[in-house]
Amino acid sequence: MNLDDAEVFVPWSNLTLRKYDPVYADLTYYSFPKEQWIALLDALHPTLIASIGEWKENISDCDNFSQHAYYFVSKSFINAGYPCQGAFMVVWSRSHAYNAFVDTEGKIWIYEPQNNKIIGDIEGTLDDVYNPDKVWFPGEVKLLTK
């Protein structure tokens, strides 16, 4: 991620996010061009899979994948020494948890951490499983390890 390409994103003033019962841990985040988000997520996905393993109901399922993905993205910004985190969030629908990120155009893209795919724009036509109810910018999270 190149800070020269970043835009400061203030979620409190984003009208799209207000529709989804948002929770914000910080005042500002960085948005980046979509291509840079994809490159970061592609680079982090093997580490995510190595960390969480295969899908298992109730122990290693969608909420665990989305929270681990959030952790690895958050940690990459901390390790890079950036002054704030990327605009990457955990999102819940009625039946699923996944992630989303904000690009420099202000679009919010849904990301499926289980298969490393961009599902579509949060404002676009989505399957019910990806119809957001809640968005969460949790701030830095820590994974429990042995």
Name every feature range the model reports, one short phrase each.
Residues 1-146:
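A structural boundary/capping signal
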